[in-house]
Regions:
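N-terminal "arm"/small-domain region of PLP-dependent enzymes with the aminotransferase-like
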Residues: 1-67
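Conserved PLP-enzyme active-site core in the AAT-like
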Residues: 5-16, 20, 40-43, 64, ...
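Short, glycine-/Ser/Thr-/acidic-enriched flexible segments
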Residues: 33, 173, 228-229, 244-246, ...
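Conserved N-terminal alpha-helix of the aminotransferase class I/II PLP-enzyme fold
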Residues: 49-94
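Short glycine-rich or small-residue beta-strand-to-loop segments that form or flank ligand, phosphate
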Residues: 59, 86-88, 166-169, 327, ...
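Structural signal for conserved beta-strand scaffold positions within catalytic alpha/beta enzyme cores
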Residues: 87, 133-135, 224, 354, ...
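Conserved C-terminal alpha-helix-loop-beta "cap" of PLP-dependent enzymes
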Residues: 294-469
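Charge-dense polyanion-binding interfaces
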Residues: 466-486
């Protein structure tokens, strides 16, 4: 059997070898190594376009890997401490949906927090599983949902012992971590699978100075966004599984929706990034930690802002904190996170990850430099000096957990009618409403629309939040479920 080591990058190496050959392409893609689209070559470069190729015997096939892709997946599994890894070219959206579709069928129950990414609820629409939502605690100052509390999960398991799986966000977008190991043990004792949306935790496994990773905690499946903090290209992801999962069945689930024309640009970026993390991840992410902690100290020294960290840990709803997440509460200077987000981009040419009602997130990773941090800190100080106000008109960014009336699948496929936001109060929602990013639904199909929720949506619109999910692009109307006539 061929011995693999982390210095190798099988897909990348095969592409380099292919480029050295004078192969005449009579296959797709039709740009024929860029000759048919010179503007594309000008944009991306000859080397990039030259390896945008189709599956062929020397390059293996993502749908049924037997050579270099299989080797790359084995190396990824070894690097992340998993039994098996799948290279995913549909983003972590496809990884999250594969986890749910692999463990739940129509009518099955799944225990999960309500503040999941829309991809998880979309998976419930697809498979017909029934969500059992855990009530989330909210930090009263910064207004963000916290982690899963063990007692509440234990109660859900007691009330729904037939649930098939538990889905955990860890870490959250803001850096909040639950008691992942304790929750995993609790679920396994009840015979349930543990699925972890680790989209924002590709870096956790590579240093003991960060919270525990999903695989290290014993989870059954984990969706890892390599492109977020691991250095690969946008839309590339890795799905990790433990020993209890059947990798061939999971592959069949992946192939239900995954493209049969897998991008070798995406796959090679995963391959190279995995090698980088395996060889240099520890030193890289410890540098990221230093940059993040420096930025946090400097921002808090400005006054008005609150860059939070491990002081949030209470052992109940916050059991650890990912300090690489530079999450900053902004309402102390009288501005919403959305407003600060827009000012940073429009006035200072600084693009951060997102802004919500009360917070911003600056994503710090392996590509950041100290001079970039200094520029961000300086801009935030300037924004406070030039734009701060009393903030009396602000509403709290408190997370609102809607009442579930119908399953997401039943609601999504029900007859619907369009109402204005104000007229929709009391109705059952038939579509998604969310700020993006982060892509956590304010409303999802099957949930009761309340006055508080409508007020939140209208306030977010007024402050410039990018709302999506509704059929109406302006989000002045919302589709609700038509009531059945007797």
């Amino acid at each position: 059997m061929k011995k693999l080591d982390q210095n190798q990058a099988p897909i990348y190496e095969a592409l380099v070898k292919l480029r050295k050959k004078r192969i005449v392409p009579f296959d797709v893609p039709g740009h024929k190594r860029g000759r048919g689209n010179p503007e594309l070559v000008e944009l991306l470069g000859e080397k990039c376009v030259g390896i945008d190729v189709n599956s062929m015997k020397p390059l293996d096939n993502l749908g049924h890997p037997i050579s270099i892709i299989r080797d790359a997946e084995e190396l990824a599994a070894d690097a992340f401490g998993a039994a098996h890894a799948f290279l995913m070219i549909g983003g972590t959206t496809s990884s999250v949906q594969t986890m749910i579709l692999s463990t739940c069928k129509a009518g099955d129950k799944i225990i999960l927090p309500r503040n999941v990414h829309k991809s998880a609820i979309n998976a419930l629409v697809l498979c017909g599983a029934i969500p059992i939502y855990i009530e989330m605690s909210v930090d009263p100052k910064i207004g963000i949902a916290l982690g899963l509390e063990n007692d509440r999960v234990a109660q859900a398991i007691k009330e729904h012992p037939d649930a098939k799986a538990i889905l955990i966000n860890n870490p959250t977008y803001y850096g909040i971590c639950s008691d992942l190991k304790g929750l995993t043990e609790m679920a396994h004792e009840a015979g349930m699978m543990v699925l972890v949306d680790e989209a924002h935790g590709a870096h956790l496994h590579f240093t003991d100075k960060l919270p525990l990773s999903a695989m290290d905690a014993g989870a059954d499946m984990a969706a890892v966004s390599m492109h977020k903090s691991g250095g690969s290209l946008t839309q590339s992801s890795i799905l990790l599984i433990g020993n209890q999962m059947n990798p061939e069945y999971v592959r069949q689930i992946i192939n239900l929706t995954q493209s049969t024309s897998a991008s070798y640009l995406l796959m090679s970026s995963l391959d190279i990034s995995r090698r980088n993390l395996a060889l240099r991840g520890k030193e890289s992410f410890e540098k990221v930690i230093e940059l993040s902690e420096y930025a946090r100290r400097e921002i808090n020294a400005i006054g008005g802002y609150y860059a939070y960290s491990k002081e949030l840990i209470d052992g109940v709803s916050v059991c650890d904190f990912d300090v690489t997440k530079l999450s900053v509460y902004t309402q102390g200077i009288g501005l919403t996170g959305i407003e600060v987000y827009d000012l940073l981009r429009d006035e200072y040419d600084i693009q951060i990850e997102f802004g919500d009602i009360g917070n911003i997130l600056a994503y710090i990773s392996i590509g950041d430099r100290i001079q970039d941090i200094e520029r961000l800190v300086g801009a935030l100080a300037d924004i406070k000096r030039l734009y701060s106000r009393d903030g009396k008109d602000l509403i709290a960014g408190e997370y609102i957990q809607p009442e579930l009336v119908l399953s997401p699948q039943e609601a999504f496929y029900s007859e619907r009618k369009s109402l204005t936001l104000d007229d929709s109060v009391g109705q059952v929602c038939g579509e998604f409403v969310m700020c993006y990013p982060p892509g956590i639904p304010i409303l999802a199909p099957g949930e009761r629309i309340t006055r508080d929720i409508v007020d939140y949506i209208q306030f977010a619109k007024e402050r410039g939040c990018s709302l999506q999910g509704t059929e109406d692009p302006e989000v002045n109307h919302i589709n609700v479920i038509k009531k059945k006539e007797n």
